[in-house]
Every structure is written in structure tokens, then in C-alpha cells.
Amino acid sequence: MSSSIPSVIVCGSQTIPPSRETLDNLASYLTKSPNPELKAVREVLLALPELWAELKATEPQFQALSDEPIITFRDWFLRHDTGSEYEDNIYNLSHLKIHERLPNILLAPLTVIIHIAQYSQYLDGLGLDDSDDCHVHIRQSTSSRNTTDIGPKFQGLCIGSLSAAALDASPTRTALAQNATAAVKLALCIGAYVDSQRLADSGSSSYSEMACFISRWGADCCREMVEEMLSRYPEAYISVELDYNSITITAPSGDMPSLQEDLSREGVRVANVPVNGRYHHSNNGRSLQSLLQLCCSDPCGPFWVPWGQDRLERYLRSILTEPAGWFSDMSETINSITPSETQMPMTTLELGLVSCIPPSLAALPRHHIIRGSLSPPTQPYNYPDTSIAIIGAACKYPGANSLDELWNIFAAGQVMYGEAPPGRFGKETVAGNFLSDADQFDYGLFGISPREAMYMDPQQRIALQVAYQAVESSGYFGSPNPDGDVGCYIGVGNSDYEDNVHSNTPTAYSFTGTSRAFVSGRISHYFKWTGPSITIDTACSSSAAAIHQACSGIILGDCSVALAGGVNIMSSFPADQNIAAAGMTNSTGPCRPFGADATGYSRGEGCGLIVLKRLADALSQGDNVLGVVVATAVNQSDGSSSITVPVLRSQSDLYRRVLSRASMKASDVSYVEAHGTGTQRGDPIEYQGAREVFGSSGRYQAKSHKVYIGSVKANIGHTEAASGVAGVLKVLLMLKHGQIPPQASFTSLNPAIPPSESGQISIATQLEKWKRNFRAACVNNYGAAGNNTAIIICQHPPKTLPSSTNTAQTLTRYPFLITAQSQVSVRRYCLALAQYIETNSKPLSLAAAFSLVAQQQNRNLRHRIAFCASSLPELWRLLTFHAQAAEDTSVLLPPSPRKQVKPIVLVFGGQTGSTLQFSKAVYDSSYHLRQNMDKCDALIQEMGLPSFFPDIFSQEPIEDIVILHSCLFSVQYAYAKAWLDAGLSVHRVIGHSFGQLTAMCISGVLTLENALILVIGRANLIRDCWGEEKGSMLSVQIDRAGAEALAWSESSLGDDSIEVACYNGPNSHVLVGSELAITNVERRASTASLATKRLKTTHGFHSKLVDAIMEQYSNLAHIVSYNAPVIPIETCSETASWKIFTPQLVTEHSRRPVYFCDAVRRVERDLGPCIWLEAGSSSGAVILAKQSLTSKSNYICGLQLGSPSTNPLDSVVDTTLELWNQGSSVQCWAYNPRDLVHPSHFLGLPGYQFDTSPHWLPCATTDHNKSNDPSPVIDGLISLERLSRPEPRVSIFELDQKDWTLAHILRGREVLGGILWPLALYMGLISRAAALLTSSIPSASRLIRFAGLEIKTPLGSDLLNGLCLRLKQVEAWSWGFSLESDCARHATGTVIVDDERTSRPPDHLSSLPDFATATTVFSAPRGVAYKLLEKVAEYDTAYRGLESISMNEDTAIARVHLPPAAGNSRFVGNTITLDQFLLVAEIHALSMEDSKRSEVFACSGFGETTISANFMRATERDRGQTWQVYTRQSAKRGREFLYDTFVYEAGEGEESGSLALALTGARFIRTSTSALQQVVELANTPSRSPVTEEIAPSPNFLQFQEGSANVWSLTVNLLHELTGCALEEISPQTILADMGMDSLAIMEIEARIREVFNVDIRISPVDMGSTVEIICERITAQTSPSHGLVNVVGNSTSNTTSSSSQCTPSSSFESDSDTQATELSLSAPTMEKVARVVATHVGSGEAVLSSSRLHSLGLDSLAVLELQSDLHVNFGVRVHLMQLDCSTTIGDLHALVMRRGVRENIYNGAV
């Protein structure tokens, strides 16, 4: 809103003669506007003839002037004013003759009237509440932007200065009415004097009419030259300095032709101005004096001007006698404007029909000019009492996951028609308008298990997510205590997903997942709503009917808020065929509503939901109203036609009914959002119905009053049950943007529709402005079963002005809290918000951004980021910084999980002096604080005290203790209530001394009124009844015994007793006594070197000095009543807190000591570590509490609102941030977020960013002619076996090891006489699987990236059982992969798929190496290169692609062509070619000088790889393709050599020189030929034993046998699958109830246990407290030996089969033998020897410790084989280490050796 408030308002010079249209609009606006200033102008306009007569009576010279112009103008306006209808009077202007030279007596007052009317219309257009004075807001805004208190904010030129004076002199809009009247009268007088001077001059023989023209010169001329020419014409003069190169010249009309010709000859451009008479000339001096006499002499006279004579004279001189220095004045004004901190444009409002802002100033950067206008008037719409506000909205439609994206589709006329996503309908091809990600769901956010999500209809899942965003956009989460009285009305038609669920084995989730009642029920259940929850099915009109029911429910009181809309997802091919068979759908393309080529509708899917609330409630509660549903209506077609065809009479009747309910005329509706499905029968009927009601020929149709019709189905198809709400959302977006979008696919009208007469109804073919002052639309939705629903939606009423208009100027920083259920969602939201800020078309202030975010964040979610920003650019930088962590975890620690909030204790301080620390800035800014302070002030005044405003803001001492205590209480109360109103959950309150009275009120013991009675009455007694000795108090740093001894010793020395008043801390106490006694104590304490401080209290409280008021105070305490506390209160009593509150205890509280330390420690003992928050400011109470606390886990928060060096609002912001970081859900109460933003922003703000994963249950086919395997297959080599089962986000691919492509690739490469998979083959298979999961990315732009690929157990020719590829999604288009079989894990890493068109280059490609300067030391032709490889591998000729290679010490450059064996298969060609690329690095390694003949190099993995789309399709493009390969040795670590390889396309094509592949960090391990031979043999030998042959593993990598794993690991997997709990979070001690299991989950796990273990386990509600360990034990007790827990023993006969992914927990499941092995002592000498052996295989110089992990030391599969051999040589132990876990340490390896029983040999030095 602030962006549209002008910094300067400029009133132009005397108007040109207005056009008839302008006069018409002016008269209509003056007639119909209720604004006070226009009522006054209307009255003076009607009285012009009478005023003119009085004026003529005062000046004889006016007698010669004609009365006709004024009388004619008045009479014309009078006819217009008394006319009944606008249409009747629009043509009654013929008698008003508009001449080019109207007299000044008419033009001058008309100028002021136009200025005031345009200004008034501008105020109306701000969208602010009529009850607020918009003019006041304008004045404050322009004042706050001006750097000086002196200088105008309203500027006027010539007659315009009168309008500016009226605006500037008016503090309110009511005052403007008086000043506008004065300005019009004054303009009449000025015009009369100018006209009379013209008439007098005409009597001269040399008279010539004075006229004006503008002169503008360029660079080849100058002002001096112009002035020199003017000197030749004595009567000509400069009247206005318009710009630095432009002036207005007034001259006799007879001189003008020659003068203008002279100027033009010198290159000066001239333009005439229709102003007649002599303004800005000294000859008008007498007229000036006469005017001053007329307007200042008689306050009761008709021409009195209430501006003061000096001010009036200044204005009159600027018009009559002095040249106008307009350019200087405007330059000074513009320069006085303070630059906006957020670099928002400076805005100037220009009023009048003549533009007068100097062009050079108008062209300044970031200078935005708004020009006043007079548009046709409209009567204010009176919203019915039953009006329903739309306060939130969200959607998900084809191509649009947000409302902004949906508008982009509408505005561009896009069509989302296309084929269904792959696999949606099996192998069938279906066209329509589809969501690309209907299977995606954020199960974690909604607390739904992955397995349950799998069985849920996607309509339920998508409705949940869209509901969350709609509720979020409504500000529901911004409320500290959201109301649960919310209804949920969802329209749902088909439930296609039933086919998917019913074709699979029934589960406990099958019914709840497919029943349509659960679509609405789940939403209500998640939000804990108690209002009606209803699913509605009226076919295609379901969502509109749901909105109708929701509005009715609110009106009837069934709920106070409602969520309404609809959802439609298609997944059943038979259902689609059924609809097609009915002849409804269009088989030729998209919907074409009302078009000549319409042949039926195309189906669509999506979801749209809106949040509704009664309009009156929404406005009073400050909700952001996006639009208003003023009426809804439903009926049924009368049956006169086919049931699926609409009936004209039924539809037109419905329109009339809904108009009647809305109290609207048909002409008020300017847009009809039709059902418009594009059918030949339905479209003409609907069009005719709309035209009959909204476009009748008898209705007056101005050009701007055109009625448009359209249908959203042209863009997104017929979304059936979600179609009605789609139309509603379209209207909301049209209201936001003020535009009517084009109808997609429309070229010509359906010939069956009769053409409209006089353009009554139009169909937009381009984006058009919605040219109505009041915008209303009717949405029609028809159901195929005959239901008609109509909804009228109109613009929201004006928004109320913020109660604190200068809030934004007082704030320097805003706090931001970003929350989500997962880290991924937090970061995605940061990115989305940063992009919104960067691309938002409307200027957004930091305050608006804060408001938007504050109202939408759900503070109860698990993860959060909190920070402050002082400018919009800083906010963007912080958001971008946090968002980048999503890709680079080194940038930032991940978003912290929301902490378990410590109990919060509110601490109220005592009286610390006679001054207060209360900030006016905080009071002005905070709605919550101000509301509570005002409440206290009102009650205090009712009790007879004066208001404490504004004295309470002063930091001067308050002498009257009654005022002091009432203020102190009010401040503490207001601060505490501000925190509570902001949603702070308080567990305990505690008050020190006086603060305990406030704490009693906040806790609920005392009402506010009773508390003030007690506080004020007590203060009155202290002031009036206290003894002569006031007393004094002294703080002493000494322990309790010392304080009591000091008090006793002083009391024993004289009559004055000393008491301990406050036990503040272990070493902090306050003594109280007479002034003399305290002075003596202070002296003695100083002698004893004790730290003391005299307190600035007014009296000696908590001492015998209080006795003087005790009796009367007791009487007072008996007057008030005491309640049980709502918030627990800890009283500062000695041994225990008060159980009940009595008058006696309250009275004694003022007399007895304050045992604050004791009370604080009791709170700590009861609640544990707490957050201690001060209720007030700078009292030091929380610091005292800190001294008494024993645990460092307590957290202290204190506001510093009175420090002169601290911005008080910043202190509130900082404290809020501290509380957020401690896990609190409190809001920042320093300002009211709803005041800072316009509702239109809420339709564009990004919603919650879901962390989704696919959940789609395949539909088993019943067609016996089709394959029983529904899995998509690619060339037979790799097939998708399972998706998202049993683990979420996991896709499992089976590999056909007998496929020809695999055999063909391996056939041409022999490694040491055997087969070993090349690294390229692993990459190829993984790439293909990733491509299958990202079919939405065109292959032509699909970019594949790998990270951290590592070969664990190499593969060869051995056919392995269960060989599969597992991909687990970790991010969008990013998967962690594992190639594994039943016996081993073979390769791991990460694969990422990007779209080359949109992705940025990976980091490792940011700086490519320069190979141009490499010096060649050795070159080898093709044959020599392969000869070097022969000691490792031999390649058949057809598989060779290396043409030549050149090398030096660390670099190799080679040329590679496509090998002949590539054939026609892209997969085969890419794999074989990629293998040739990798050979370049291997050849370089083999060629090094220190390479031994018995050594070879094997690649075990790499760091990062990027494969371009060009390379992936190279084999298809050109059989003669060649590449240039550059390789460099980037690092050398012992036996490990790292290489980087870059491949560029060679040749002369357009792709030449482009990067095909980049591979960095390839690890080549130097190993012996014999070690590699072992690897080859192992990879080619059938029936390998997976883990050990003779040695059992140590406890650190104990793994269950196949049978035992089926209890623990399968149980854990089942629980993970059903609850969504992460595997790593499930331990034996995990309690079932803590995993979020409900009754359905219990039923499902019982069924799954029966299915897996064949045992019957019943889990009762009592068992919900059981642990996972107990459940496993119960299963074990019933299982057969094949399923039982089998202990793993450490002897040579034990053979184990390991699951690489599941380890036993360290729990009671460990066997006895395992425990004994764990307890074996480790021998230091043996450990050293093992470490030395390992070190020889590492060779990196890194220290090898017992805790060192083998994996981190670089021991890959090849190195492990050599280590295995060396262990046998050194220790006589044969161990197989290939299956060791990645966490295996040196200590674990040592334990393996020890368990072989060879310690004796080692100790005897056998090795």
C-alpha cells in the first residue's frame, strides 16, 4: 500500500477548456459522491450565480462582465444534479457551449473544482476504509518523506496553488471541505479581476488580447538569446519558468506571430497555451490589494479565506503579480524527499487537465508519476449482510502449482493439453490436461506412513497439500490460537484409484484410502477442525456446490470459517473410456468453448480450494480479503431435455435468483465465467442464458461497460469436480490484476450461437484491462446430472488504514522465521521466497515481506531458520544463502530441528526507582501493547486518576507514588499481555515485591479491575498514611548468614532496626531501615569491603515501616476477590508457594521479606531448566533470577527498551529471535503484521514447499492377453521391479544378466584372462535407470551427473542371484544408488539428472584446465597404446576407439573415435566409447617411470562426473564421431593416483568443441597383478561365500543370518514402512506410541506380521506402550527355527549370509559368544603390528589409529584383497574382508585377527 502513496502532490495551472466527456464525468462524480469535500464543492458550484452577484456588488469594475457563462454552467449542472438516472442526463449537454476562450471567471474556479474532484477520486481508489480519513494518511505520508519540517508537500502552479493551499491547510477531510470552498470562491475572484483587466485594456487604442505560449530551446540556443529577443517586444514578458530550458511567455496576441517566428528561426520550439489575460504581472498590484481586502476583512463574509493574511498574500502574489519560478520550486521539493531505504520509486500525484511537471524532473530515475483522472462514477456497492469473504486460496492444476503460475497460463492464453504422464494408465495412451506429479506426496508433513500413503487416493493426497497451502495463505497459522470451528466442504466426483487399490491385496488402508468421505475427513482431522466435514458429488459442479454449501454453513452458524473447493485426478483407463463412450469428450484436442471448431471437452485434473469467512468478521479481524462471495444459488434443470444437457430457462432463472440475493442489477456484472465445456449442444444454451440476463439489449451499454464471457476449460481442460473452483480462482486473479485474459483457442464464434447485438457480450481474444470501477463476476458451473450452481464474486471492500501509520518508518529490522517439517522444505521455501522477491512485479517493501511470511508460517513444524533483515536486498541475500545449503551442505549447517521448548517463566520486577522505561515507539508500533495500555489507562481514569499519557513516555521522575505505581503496573501488565496475546505459552509467573501484584493479575488470581483497585489503593495508603520516616533500602553482596548477621548487629547498636527485605540470591540481599540506620550499615559494609548499592526506592518496603498502613491495607485487600490461578504463580514466600490466595497473605506480602531466591529455585526444581523472560523493561529481575539458578541450561531473556543506545523495537525483535531459537512459537508483537501489506500480495506469495516422494500403487491388469508383469521394461536389460515399496522414495530395478547387450559389451574386453565389468558399464546402467525416472525431461536435454561412485565388489561373468539396482531419492532428480546382489554390494554413489536448458554448470566445471601449453614427451599410435594395456586388459579390434595419444609427466591428450562394435544401440555405443575415454588415464598411469612390470592400475571410482546430452545421443547422430580427450594427474597419495578427464567433441559440426564429458577425481590404485588376478577370479567364480570362511566378524559388524534378520530387520522395516519413522531412529527401546501408530496402523502391522512371519501377534491399546524389542521377543517366541534368532558364534564352522544394509542393534539380541568376544582384551603390540600392515597399503602418511576407518584411509576392494593376503602372511590368519562395512575400523580388524585364536603364535614372535 505504501508504494502508491505519493511523496508530492502537484496541482496544475489553469485548465484548458474541458471536453464534454470530462465535464460529464465531473458532474456525475460531484452529484453522486458522498465525500464531504465534494458535497461542499457541489454546494458552492450551485451557488455560483449568487456569489457572482455579491462579488459584482463589491467591485464596480465587474459590472461590465457577463453573467451568462456562470449561470449557464450552474443551470447545466443543476439539471444533472436533479436527474434520476445517469443515462437520462448524458445527452442533456447541448445547451452548454464550450468555446476555446472561456472567460477566466469560469475557467479559474473550474480548475480548482477539477483538482479537488480528481484528488477525491484518487483517495477513493486507494482501497482504504471510508471510515478512515485517507487525506490524513496522505498528509502524514508526505510529511514523513520530507527531510525538513519547512517546505511544501503540496505544490501548485498559478491557479493550481489555490488547490494546493486548500489541501495543505486541511488537517482532515472535513477541513478540506471548508478550504476547498474557499479556494473555489477565491478562484472566481481572481478570474473576475483578470477578466475585468482584459476588458479595461480593450478600451485602449493600442489594445491587443494577451495570450500565452510555451518556448523550449535546445543545446544550440540559450535563455539569454530568448530574453534578448523578448526585449524587442515591450509588452511581452516571461510569466512562468517551466524547466531549465523552457518558459511560458505572455504577449499581446498581435505580437505573437512575429515573436514566435523570430524564436523559431533560432531553433526555439513554441506551442500555444489557451490562457487569456494577464497573470504573473506587476500591473495586477491593485487587484491584489483589493482581493486581500475582500478576503480578509470580514470573517463572516462570503469570501472569507481562513488561511491568514500573510499566507494568502503569498499565494495571490504567485498568481497575479510575480513570475512563477516553477522549475526552482519543484526542484527544491523533489530534492527534499528522503530517498527510500528500500529504493522504492518516488511517487508524484499530478492533478488537473494540464501536465506541468518539468520534463527534466519527470524523467528522473525511479520517479513515478500518477496522473489524476475523472472516470465515470459508480454508486458504492452495499455488501449484503450474508456476504462471505475469500481470505485464502491455493491450487494445483496442469502446469500450475501456484496461483501465480495459473494466472500466467490464463494471461498468455496457454493450453495445457497433452499426453498423460508415462505409466499413469499402464501402456495405454490417453490425452488430456494432466498433472505431471500426481503421484508425489509429502507424507512426513501430514504424519502419514509411506505405506498408507501408497493406498491413499491421490485425490486425498493432493487435496491435503492444497488445503495446507490455502489455509496457510489465509493467515490461519499466523494466529496464536487458531479457531477449530472450521468446516470442510470438498467436491469429489470419480474415485479412479479404486481400480489400483482393488487390484492389489486388501490392507487396513484399502477402504480409508479410497472412500471419498475421507477426502474432506482427512483434512479436518489433520487440522483438528470441529466444523462440518462433507464430501459433495454433483458431478462436474461438485466444487461450486461445495462452495455454496460452505457459504450456507457459515451463514447458518454451522462453522465460522470454511474450506471449500474440489479435486479431480484421473488414473483409470476404463473410467476414461466410459466418459468417451458417452460422447462428451473431444478426441481431436483441447476444449474450445464457444468456438466454431468446438467438438467436446478434453478432461483435466487438478485441485482448487478457497478459505471462506463472513465478510463482517473478516474485516473486523483484519483478514486479507481477496474477493467477496456476495451470493450463491443452486437449482436443478427442469427435465425438459436430456439429463446431461443444460436447460436455458433453468440457467437464466438461476442467474436472476443469484442477482437478487446479491442485491445487484444485471449491469453490475461485467464478466461471466461460464461452464463452457466446448460442446455443440451445451455452449449455445449457456451463452444464450448469459446473454438473456447479463447482456439484454435494453441495457445501456457504454463502451467501457462491455460484458465478457469466458471459460477456464480452454486453458486447463474440464477438471470436472474441480472445475467450478477453477473458475472462482480465475475471477480472483482477474480482480487482483484488473485484467480479463484472452480465451484460449478461440478464433470465431460457434455458428449455433446467434451473434450478439451491439456487442452485448464479448469474448476476449487478448489480455484486456477490466474497465470497471466496481468489478463483479458471475461463475456458472453445471453438473452433468442436472445441477446448476451460480456464484457472484466481486472485489473486496476498501481495506482499513493501519492504526499506526508511521510504523514502517520506525523499524530498522524485521525478524523472519521460516519453518517446515523437513530441512528440504525449509530450503526450498527460502529459494521460492527469494525468487518471489526478485521477480514480483509489484514493489514489495520489507515490512510487507515480513507480514506475508509472519502470517503464513506454521511455527509448530519440526525445522526452522530464524534471522533478521534490515532491507529487502539483505532479506534476499539471506534467503538465497540459506537456499543454497540445499545443494551445498558446506555452506551452512542444516536448518535446526525445533527444540523441545523449555518451560517459560514470566518474571515481574519490583519498584527500582521513580522513573519508568517505557518506549513511545513500541507503544505506537505494537497493536497488542497499545491495546492493553489503553485498557489500563481507561480504568485508571474511571477510578479518578488522570490519564498517564503522554507523561508515561517521559523518563523524568514521577513524584506521585500513586501515579508511579499505576504506571508501573500498567507497563508490566501490558508487556506480559503482549507476549501472551502473541502466543507465548507461559508455565509459571513470578513477581519480585511489587511485581507479585502484577503477576497475580496475569495469572488470573486478580481481574484487571481488582488488581488496579489493589495497586492504586495501596499506593494511596503509602502516600497518605506512611509515617514520617520513609526508610531506605541497601543492596549488599553477601551470603544469607552474613546479611542476617549484619542486620542483627546493626539493630543491636541502637534503636533503629535493620531487616533483610529481599533474599535476591545466594550472595545478594537487600537491607531496609531508616535513612540513618542504612547510612551506618553502608559505612560498616564499606569498611568490610562489601559491595553495596543504595536503591532508588521511594520507601523502605518489607519492613516495620509498612506497619503504619497494614490495617487499612488489610481492609482494602478484603474488598477484592481472589480466583484460582489460570497460570501457576510462584509467590516469593520462604518455604513454599501459597496454595490459596487470601486477603491476609496479600497484606502480609508487603510486610514480609521477599524470598525471591527461594522461589526461583523452587521453580527450577519443579520445572527443570527454563526460559526466564522479563515482563517489563530493564528492571533487572531476570538478572536476579539468573544469580539464583543452579543449572546453566536455563535461558535468560530481558528487554532493553529504555536504553538510549538501543532501538527499543530492535530489543523486541532480538528477544523474539532468541525465543524462536529456543523453539518457541511466539509471534513478534512489536507491530501488527496484518497492517503492513495489501491483500493482493497474498495471491502471489509462494506457499509451503513440499518434500515429496512418489506414492503410486500399480494397477494389476485383468486382461489375460496381456503380460502379468506391469513393469516398464527398457530393451530387456533393465526393468523397474518396484517403486516406493517397501521403502519410500526407493525404486528397485532388476538387471537381466543374460541380456545380449551386456554380453556384447563384455565380449570385447578381457582382463587377465577373465571378465571384469568396466566402470563405464556401471555408469551406463545407472544412467538408464535415472532416465526412466525422469521421463519428463527430453532426452535431448537430459544431463547426467555422478558423485562419489565407488566400486565395492567388482562384477564379472558370474551370474548372481538377485542382482538389482536400488535408487533412493534424496532430492528432486537426485538419487543415491546401490548396485547389489544377494551376496554383496557392488557399487554405490549418487546420480543426478538435470535439464541442460535450465541448470547451471556444476561446480567442478567452473574452471576447466588449460591443456594448450602442455608439452608432449611421449606419443604413441593406436597399436602401441593398446600394447601398453596388454598386461591388464586386451581389447578386440572392433572395440578399440583410441586413435593416438600424447603424454608428458602429468598430462595425456588422445583422440578417440566411435568403435565399430558400438552398433546401432545408443546404450552399447555410449558404454563402449565411455570405456575408451577412461583408458587414457590408465595408459598414462601405466607409462609412468616408476611403474613396475608386476604392477597394474585399476580404477575403483571417481569424485564427480558430468555427461552431456550431446554425448548420450552421439552414436545416433554420426557414425564417424570423434572426440578429443584431455587427462591430467591431479593428485598422488601413496598407492592412489587421482586423474581428471575432459572430453570434447571434435570435427567440424555445430557441436564441435562442446564438452561431452567431465570426470574428476578418478581413483587409480597401484596394485600387483596377482591381487588383481584374485579380484578377477572372485568375480568369475560361482557360489562365492559372502562374508567369512574361517573367521566370524567382530561385534561391530555382526549381522544376522538370513533367518534371524527376518525378526529384527524385517520388523524394523515393517515399522518404517507403516509409520514413516527413519530406520536409524528405530531402536529396541523405541515405544510404539511414540512412532505415531494409530488403530489402522496397528491392524496393518498385525496383518503384515502374519504375512511375513506366519505368527499371530495381537497388539492391544495397552501394548502401545511396548517397545520394539518386546514385539520382536513376542515374534521370536512364536517363530519356527527358520525364523528364530540364531546366534552368530565365532568358530570356523559358522557360515553367515549378510544383508549389507541391515545390522543388528547393540541390545539384548547379542549372543553370549558375541558378548565374550566383545570382552576380549586387546593387545597393544598386536594392534601396532596390524596398524603397520595396514599402513603399508595406505601409503598416504596419514596416522593409522585404532579408530581409523579402513574406508576413510582409501582402502578399496583391490587394496583390501592385498591386505587380506598380507594378514595371512603376517598372522597366519586367512580372512575374507570384501564384505566389511564402511564403518570398519583398525580396532575391528584387530579383533578379527584375535578371534582366530592365534595369540600365542603372535606373542612368541612367529611373524
Swiss-Prot record:
It comes from the Eukaryota. SUPFAM superfamilies: ACP-like, FabD/lysophospholipase-like, Probable ACP-binding domain of malonyl-CoA ACP transacylase, Thiolase-like. Residues 385-795 form the Ketosynthase family 3 (KS3) domain. It comes from Aspergillus versicolor. Multidomain protein; including a starter unit:ACP transacylase (SAT) that selects the starter unit; a ketosynthase (KS) that catalyzes repeated decarboxylative condensation to elongate the polyketide backbone; a malonyl-CoA:ACP transacylase (MAT) that selects and transfers the extender unit malonyl-CoA; a product template (PT) domain that controls the immediate cyclization regioselectivity of the reactive polyketide backbone; and 2 acyl-carrier proteins (ACPs) that serve as the tether of the growing and completed polyketide via its phosphopantetheinyl arm. It holds the Pfam family PP-binding. Residues 107-280 form the Starter acyltransferase (SAT) domain. This is Triacetic acid lactone synthase cle1. Chevalone E derivatives produced by this cluster are interesting candidates for cancer therapy since they synergistically enhance the cytotoxicity of doxorubicin (DOX) in both MDA-MB-231 and MCF-7 breast cancer cell lines. Keywords: Acyltransferase, Multifunctional enzyme, Phosphopantetheine, Phosphoprotein, Repeat, Transferase. PANTHER family: FATTY ACID SYNTHASE (PTHR43775), NON-REDUCING POLYKETIDE SYNTHASE AUSA-RELATED (PTHR43775:SF21). InterPro entries: Ac_transferase_dom_sf, ACP-like_sf, Acyl_transferase_dom, Acyl_Trfase/lysoPLipase, Ketoacyl_synth_AS, Ketoacyl_synth_C, Ketoacyl_synth_N, Malonyl_transacylase_ACP-bd. Residues 1605-1679, 1721-1797 form the Carrier domain.
